[in-house]
């Protein structure tokens, strides 16, 4: 890991955005660390003219309501629409009875639409660790719950920002 202060982070992000040949994109999804620091400020400031919305990715826990409030305030300040929230690592499905087990507890009430709840998935984690996420998703498009939910989420977001089906 590299510990960079604000100006170095900002320059690295701007270099990545401006010096990369992205080709023709319909969408650019940017995965940011939690919080409203330099990374989020730089991305939203630079991409503001084309920013279609923000999706909050949360994990269940007691501090979630506080995190959502901060993120909504940040979105308001930068003039971005919060499209909704995705709850990551929300549950494990029991292989014996299909009951949903929530190892991190329930989410509780948040003032943002929940777009999707994603399960903990050991096969997915293994694919990520081995650098095989794309192959995993392609090979499991119909069989894996996490993959199905990601594709469903993608369709929901396209409908929201474009008003059309994929």
Regions found by a protein language model. Name each.
Residues 1-42, 47:
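Switch II (G3) loop of P-loop NTPases
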Residues 72-166:
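C-terminal lobe/tail of nucleotide-utilizing enzymes
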Residues 49-54, 78-82:
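Short glycine-/polar-rich loops that comprise or flank the Walker A/P-loop
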Residues 7, 33-34, 60, 81, ...:
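Proline-centered helix-kink/hinge sites
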Residues 23-37, 50-71:
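Conserved Switch II/interswitch segment of TRAFAC-class P-loop GTPases
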Residues 44-47, 70-74:
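Short, solvent-exposed amphipathic alpha-helical segments in soluble enzyme
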Residues 5-12, 32-39, 63-67, 78, ...:
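Helical mechanochemical/support elements of P-loop NTPase systems and associated helical scaffolds
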